[in-house]
Amino acid sequence: MPSASDHSFSFPILIGDIGGTNARFALLVDAASEPTQLPPVKTGDFATIEDALQNGIFNKISVRPRSAILAVAGPIKSDEIPLTNAGWVIRPKDMLARLGLEDVLVINDFEAQALAIAAPADQDVVQIGGGSVRPRSSRVVLGPGTGLGVAGLVFAQDTWIPVPGEGGHVDIGPRTERDFRIWPFLDPIEGRMAGEQILCGRGIMNLYRAVCAADGVEPLFKDQAEVTTSALSGDDPAAIETVTLFATYLGRVAGDMALVFMARGGVFLAGGISQKILPALMRPDFRAAFEDKAPHSALMRTIPTFAVVHPMAALSGLAAFARAPRDFGVAMEGRRWRS
């Protein structure tokens, strides 16, 4: 039985990024190997994660994992971990009993994204604008997706320490004359405008409808994919403005997070939305909003911003941690279960 202070995990290690619709897994056979991608699992196809792993993965592979490290979108407060946007409840004790695992660690999904930005490969990121990375300096990752995820990564005592939080729910307010025209038409949450009300998939639609309402025109599009596609092709003025404003507002919030963490190591934009609208993020609006932080605009110009283009960034972060857990200050108390 490992001691309570032991930070190592027994190989093979199953790593998993569990979202609202899809759960993606990979297998690390040993510390020197690259993760082997496993078939993705749709959460709606299985009643429990145990069923999904047994029938969707374990029955199809010859190597049996001894440990599991999972990233989930949901609060980790007890032996039962409900997922925010899916019907599963993760019960690590059941995983130990039913799947023959020896060790299960569950962390926040954006902790995994933060782990991935400690040492990203050049081909996994695209720089937006100027600035340069200061080694071993704090970093921030933001991810517009189902919601707006935010996490920091701080280097202290020769260790990268992920700092999860709820930064996506910070206040966001109007600054320009155009903002003040649009803001009354935005759908708030409990009387206030949080970043996540705009900077996520449904937030794109919230912003698009507000732009249309401010101009007295009827919305043409019904979902955010139509809005972003039309904007990038230059077909519809309201869609173009929506994505331009989205990039601007994302730049403002990203700049705020950079100031909070003094993120001289860089600010990273993760997730599918950032990848899809990358052409818009590469235009001046995002970076101008990011740098517009008087009295610290000169400082902001030195902080680099990147889009993460790795297709499985969270799994990449989990793999880095699984190989060398002592290189990272991941809190395990109350989040690790062993047989």
From Swiss-Prot:
SUPFAM superfamilies: Actin-like ATPase domain. It is found in: Cytoplasm. GO terms for cellular component: cytosol. One of its GO terms (biological process) is glycolytic process. Keywords: ATP-binding, Cytoplasm, Glycolysis, Kinase, Nucleotide-binding, Transferase. The keyword RNA-binding does not apply. Its main location: cytoplasm. It is an enzyme of class 2 (transferase). Gene3D superfamilies: 3.30.420.40, 3.40.367.20. Its EC number is 2.7.1.2. ATP binds at residues 16-21. GO terms for molecular function: ATP binding; D-glucose binding; glucokinase activity. It catalyses: D-glucose + ATP = D-glucose 6-phosphate + ADP + H(+). NCBIfam families: glk, PRK00292.1-4. Belongs to the bacterial glucokinase family. PANTHER family: GLUCOKINASE. This is Glucokinase. It comes from Sinorhizobium fredii (strain NBRC 101917 / NGR234). The gene is glk.
